[in-house]
């Protein structure tokens, strides 16, 4: 059965985590914001939206089943990936009329156990203004594979992406948030139409002491 998403990249996802708080309870990080972002991606990809309450309740019901998989180690977490893909048995170029929404989880440790060397990418582009950068589209990740491999061949572990127009302004890092300490203040890249960071939106105005 040939699925439309296999040929058109009609797939998008979110990446979330569940942790245990000091009381041992399982908690989610900004689930309604993630639901909103999921729907923003859906609209951009011509896919159906999901009611935010339904999205969040689905996660809660799944965590009731998978709660024993949430690590107790405070540096570990349960990775959660909600995603949707087209299911029409059609190979033409058009939005699908049917989709499947799924969520899978797996326990994970710290992504990196030590500081890593990173490369500032000034040749290749992950996402451009007006494109699908703010949508968690599968094609965004495919665009990063080749430059990431080149960086790894040079001994780097990750990329820091710059703007597509001038390669002058830092936008984001590949698998993490990027921030700097400048004049005693914590500085993060501006939120743009290529990426939105909820960690950025969560950070208060911070002064490094």
Residue ranges and their predicted role:
Residues 6, 10-158, 165-169:
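Conserved alpha/beta cores of soluble small-molecule-handling proteins
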Residues 136-204:
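Glycine-rich phosphate/ribose-binding loops and adjacent secondary-structure elements
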Residues 1-8, 12, 200-209:
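Single conserved hydrophobic/aromatic residue that forms the stacking wall/gate
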